[in-house]
């Protein structure tokens, strides 16, 4: 009974707060590592609450889902031979045999790997509003974030060292790989324009400070997350910041 009461309390808590401060943020863009070969897609969905400190400053914590990822640079791998049972084919010296071309030269395969990583993310940014005109604001944002990885996958294509169909493509859970880290934390900054309606559109960047993977048998280098997002924020009260002080300009 007590657990049910607590669950109901936390479920209804957002509705007990003033609706004018609730907001929903959606974002999409690009993510990678500082040393990644190419960026991949990034997404963000978060529900937040803005605590106004005065007519310019506000604290806006939010909690939601963040999708990140990265790509590794392509690399060559030997095209190894296996028998029908998937066991390595070896020569008299016990060495794993490698496929060769018509001239007897070893054949190599180009291996490509890309990663997705899904996080539950808590943002704690500070907003500064600069009034441009009536009902129109420029919003500057800076703060910190912390996140915990809950899912994702590594997709490998063209791995010549694998057997059977895995030479073509296979996947592994991102956070089950040796050297992977679920915790992520870093800094965030951005700028946005608040329309006279309930919508705010902007750009934000997230800079990871903690390595999310270490050098290991599964990773050739250490990596930290970085992302750039186009964001859209919906405020549940269209009358937000209608009244401005005389010194707002």
Walk through the language-model features, giving the residues of each:
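Extracellular/periplasm-exposed beta-strand and loop segments of Gram-negative cell-envelope proteins
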Residues: 32-38, 68-119, 148-184, 188, ...
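Repeated loop/turn-to-beta-strand initiation elements of outer-membrane beta-barrel proteins
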Residues: 22, 56-59, 136-138, 197-203, ...
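Residues on the lipid-exposed face of transmembrane beta-strands in outer-membrane beta-barrel proteins
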Residues: 26-30, 45-55, 63-65, 122-128, ...
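Sec-dependent N-terminal signal peptides
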Residues: 4-15
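Short glycine/proline- and aromatic-enriched beta-strand/turn motifs that initiate or cap beta-hairpins
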Residues: 19-50, 233-249
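Extended, folded domain segments that form the structural surfaces/walls around functional sites
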Residues: 113-131, 138, 150
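Membrane-proximal, glycine/serine-rich, low-complexity loop/turn segments characteristic
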Residues: 137-145, 206, 242-249
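Positively charged n-region of N-terminal signal peptides that target proteins for export
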Residues: 1-4, 19-20
């Amino acid at each position: 009974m007590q657990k049910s009461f607590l669950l109901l309390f936390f479920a209804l808590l957002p509705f007990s707060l003033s609706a004018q401060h609730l907001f929903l943020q959606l974002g999409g863009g690009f993510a990678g590592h500082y040393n990644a070969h190419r960026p991949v897609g990034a997404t963000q969905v978060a529900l937040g609450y803005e605590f106004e400190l005065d007519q310019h400053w506000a604290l806006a914590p939010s909690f939601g889902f963040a999708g990140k990822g990265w790509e590794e640079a392509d690399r060559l791998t030997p095209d190894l031979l296996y028998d029908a049972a998937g066991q390595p084919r070896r020569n008299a010296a016990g060495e794993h045999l490698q496929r060769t071309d018509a001239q007897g030269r070893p054949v190599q395969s180009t291996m490509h790997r890309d990663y997705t990583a899904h996080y539950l993310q808590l943002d704690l940014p500070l907003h500064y509003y600069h009034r441009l005109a009536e009902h129109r604001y420029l919003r500057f944002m800076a703060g910190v974030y912390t996140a915990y990885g809950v899912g994702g996958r590594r997709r490998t294509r063209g791995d010549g060292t694998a057997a059977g169909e895995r030479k073509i493509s296979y996947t592994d859970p991102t956070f089950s790989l040796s050297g992977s880290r679920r915790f992520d934390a870093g800094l965030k900054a951005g700028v946005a324009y608040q329309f006279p309606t309930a919508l705010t559109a902007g750009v934000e960047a997230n800079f990871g400070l903690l390595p999310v993977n270490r050098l290991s048998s599964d990773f050739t280098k250490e990596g930290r997350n970085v992302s750039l997002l186009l964001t859209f924020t919906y405020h549940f009260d269209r009358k937000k910041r209608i009244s401005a002080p005389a010194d707002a300009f």
